[in-house]
Curated annotation (Swiss-Prot):
Residues 66-229 form the SIS domain. Signal peptide: none annotated. The lineage of its organism: Bacteria, Bacillati, Cyanobacteriota, Cyanophyceae, Synechococcales. It comes from Synechococcus sp. (strain CC9605). Residues 1-25 are annotated as: Disordered. This is N-acetylmuramic acid 6-phosphate etherase. It comes from the Bacteria.
């Protein structure tokens, strides 16, 4: 049972926010049979995809800006509280195994820290200064990027972080699910995922959360494509850290370079587990040291590195 704190003061009335409004389609939610309930959920869950598609120009601007900063040595931070913060942590955690990126390159910062991943700590979102403090603790600087995530656009913790990022000349990106005029945020790029009122009024872990996850997937993956972590549609910088990913690495070598499994294992071992190096070694006939130097010359971009040797891979 929740414990009510009589000393806790309510926020200003947030009833005008899109995410707090009642969805008329679900006014009898508690009276629907199970199938009708699930069909309604499925129908409303089309809205997140539509919301992400509608902000493609702003997302593209964010991708290019973040990629440029990461290429120059900057980092990407997701900052949020509750569901929004947890989604940022999730996306950041997936980057190292998928793209073999430095764990410090993309970071999720959640109000309340790691304990808030498992146990709700929403009260911490009310402290605006904490957003700045959590970034400062991580050495956030002018060359870095911040995505401040707040479904309702009013979270003081996120506002504080975005204001700090703006004040030092870092890239500040706001991600919210209400129109800008309802909850303006200090930012350089403003992304508004308008998913509409939730079926369960105010429960932004639903459509707003789904849209946020889709947008973060898109942002981080597109940035990594720009950084040369992908060839065709293959994750050629995958970290072969478990049996499944070793198998995936071997299949990438087979499909793109025609390397059979036994030879692929040898190449992977020589390349220290780097699929990208192994592909360049196989296609251009290079030693591991030659492949490393060549990739460095081409800023870790596999396609131009191959082209310099007149080599190419399949596009499967």
């Amino acid at each position: 049972m929740a414990v009510f704190d009589p000393d806790l003061q309510p926020s200003s009335d947030r009833g005008h926010l899109l995410t707090e409004q009642s969805n008329q389609r679900s006014s009898h939610l508690d009276q629907l049979d199970t199938l009708a309930l699930l069909e309604l959920f499925a129908d409303e869950d089309r809205r997140p995809q539509e919301a992400v598609a509608a902000v493609a120009p702003a997302l593209a601007q964010a991708v290019d800006a973040v990629a440029n900063r990461l290429r120059a040595g900057g980092r990407l931070f997701y900052l949020g509280a509750g569901t929004s913060g947890r989604l940022g942590v999730l996306d950041a955690a997936e980057c190292p195994p998928t793209f073999c990126s430095d764990p410090q390159q993309v970071q999720g910062v959640l109000a309340g820290g790691s304990a808030a991943l498992l146990r709700s700590s929403e009260g911490l979102e009310d402290i605006e200064a904490a957003g700045r403090a959590d970034l400062e603790e991580r050495g956030f600087s002018t060359k870095d990027c911040l995505v401040g995530i707040a479904a309702g656009g009013t979270t003081p913790y996120v506002r504080g972080g975005l204001a700090f990022a703006k004040s030092i000349g870092a890239l500040a990106i706001a991600l919210a699910c209400v129109p800008t005029e309802q909850a303006p945020l200090p930012c350089d790029i403003d992304i508004r995922l308008l998913t509409g009122p939730e079926l369960l009024t105010g429960s932004t872990r639903m459509k707003a959360g789904t849209a946020t996850k889709l947008a973060l997937n898109t942002l981080s993956t597109a940035v990594m494509v720009k950084l040369g972590k992908v060839y065709g549609n293959r994750m050629v910088d995958v970290a072969a850290s478990n049996s499944k990913l070793v198998d995936r690495s071997l299949r990438i070598l087979r499909d793109l370079a025609g390397v059979e499994r036994e030879r692929g294992l040898t190449l992977l071992e020589e390349a220290g587990g780097s699929v990208k190096l192994a592909l360049l070694m196989a296609a251009a006939g290079l030693s591991v040291d030659q492949a490393k130097a060549h990739l460095q010359q081409y800023d870790q971009q596999l396609r131009p590195a191959l082209a310099a040797y007149g080599a190419q891979l399949a596009e499967a």
